[in-house]
């Protein structure tokens, strides 16, 4: 009699299940607090299967962050690329947040804090993502007609990062509302004569 392997263990889709588990657990519990055993349990794979796909937990953390980066970042960051809004509307949309949602923070900021100096590959991905997002803000500020798009893009990046961090610390979206209001003032001042 042949016994079937338990459903959902190893085999096809194991790498994807591990990445899905990492996304859920790193977001909910943190990177350091989530061990390989917890990841394999959540992904329904053996440790052997885990190590067939990822050479280390650090390797998984890097892939987790790369995946988010290539998707355009967090949903709030993806708003900068929305095709159905004006450049001004896209710059403001990054500050929008669903009311009542549990705020866990930016995965890149969280990873940078948890990585400290222990995971240089993670630091490189975090730097790349933050610089890329700022460049996208600068590009959109140019489209919005800002006289100094570099300055406006960087100001909005700092405002966004600070508002997200405070909102996460307080588990309250009101810092994002205040930041959106401040962003409106910055955008208006930077584009007052542009007509866009």
Predicted regions located by residue number:
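Hydrophobic alpha-helical connector segments
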Residues: 63, 76-104, 149, 153-156
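Basic, helix-initiating cap at the start of DNA-binding domains
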Residues: 1-29, 33-45, 59
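Short hydrophobic/aromatic patch on the recognition helix
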Residues: 43-54
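Amphipathic alpha-helical packing segments from all-alpha helical-bundle domains
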Residues: 73, 89-92, 119-143, 154, ...
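Hydrophobic alpha-helical segments that form the core
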Residues: 104-107, 148-169, 178, 182-186
């Amino acid at each position: 009699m042949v016994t079937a392997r338990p459903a959902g263990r190893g085999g096809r889709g194991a790498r994807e299940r591990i990445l899905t588990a990492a996304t859920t657990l790193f977001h909910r519990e943190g990177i350091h607090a989530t061990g390989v055993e917890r990841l394999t349990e959540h992904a329904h794979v053996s440790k052997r299967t885990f190590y067939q796909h990822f050479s280390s937990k650090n390797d998984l953390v890097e892939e987790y962050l790369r995946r988010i980066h290539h998707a355009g970042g967090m949903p709030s960051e993806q708003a900068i690329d929305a095709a159905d809004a004006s450049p001004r509307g896209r710059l403001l949309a990054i500050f929008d947040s669903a009311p009542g949602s549990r705020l866990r923070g930016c995965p890149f900021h969280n990873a940078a804090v948890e990585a400290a100096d222990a995971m240089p590959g993670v630091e490189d991905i975090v730097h790349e993502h933050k610089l890329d997002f700022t460049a996208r803000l600068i590009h959109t500020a140019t489209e919005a007609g800002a006289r100094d798009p570099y300055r406006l893009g960087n100001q909005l990046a700092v405002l966004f990062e600070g508002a997200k961090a405070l909102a996460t610390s307080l588990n309250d979206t009101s810092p994002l509302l205040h930041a959106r209001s401040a962003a409106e003032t910055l955008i208006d001042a930077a584009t007052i004569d542009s007509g866009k």
